[in-house]
């Protein structure tokens, strides 16, 4: 009986002492939006022309894996802020929008990327209201962490 009890307790000890190795690292870092490169566009205070295309170019990075990126262009005729702009560009007078430009667009990031450069053509309609606009960039990593960068731009 003692041998059985000893064998049972020894087996129980080894079974409970074996811990499943969980080397999975939990991602707690926000992804990064980089618009400082020479060819990045738009940048703070960039001017965009009505009726013309421009190329959105930025670099995104994450410590584990990027998920998605989206752009939101909307008017700033009321001088609101998203608290991400580093400086203002000198506002036009406050005005009521008649036909403002609004664009909300997702851009794909291939799976498994830690660094990605986006290059996307955006057409600005010719008949929109000129003035102050915000160009918001949102990048989300696979874990769900999101970084937002707001740029003040002018549409002429």
Predicted regions and their residues:
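Short, intrinsically disordered low-complexity segments
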Residues: 2, 18-19, 137
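Sec-dependent signal peptide recognition
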Residues: 2-9
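Short, linear, compositionally biased motifs with a strong N-terminal bias
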Residues: 10-11, 149
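Bacterial Sec-dependent N-terminal signal peptides
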Residues: 11-39
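First exposed extracellular module after export/assembly in secreted or surface-exposed proteins
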Residues: 28-156
């Amino acid at each position: 009986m003692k041998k059985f009890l000893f064998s049972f307790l020894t087996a129980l000890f080894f079974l409970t002492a074996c811990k499943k190795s969980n080397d999975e690292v939990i991602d707690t870092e926000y992804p990064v939006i980089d618009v400082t490169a020479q060819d990045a566009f738009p940048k703070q205070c960039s001017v965009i022309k009505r009726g013309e295309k421009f190329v959105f170019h930025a670099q995104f990075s994450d410590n584990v894996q990027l998920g998605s990126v989206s752009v939101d262009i909307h008017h700033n005729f009321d001088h609101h802020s998203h608290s991400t702009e580093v400086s203002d560009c000198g506002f036009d007078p406050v005005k009521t929008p008649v036909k403002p430009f609004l664009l909300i667009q997702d851009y794909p990031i291939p799976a498994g990327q830690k660094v990605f450069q986006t290059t996307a053509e955006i057409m600005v309609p010719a008949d929109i209201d000129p003035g102050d606009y915000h160009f918001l960039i949102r990048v989300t990593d696979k874990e769900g962490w999101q970084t937002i960068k707001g740029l003040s731009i002018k549409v002429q």
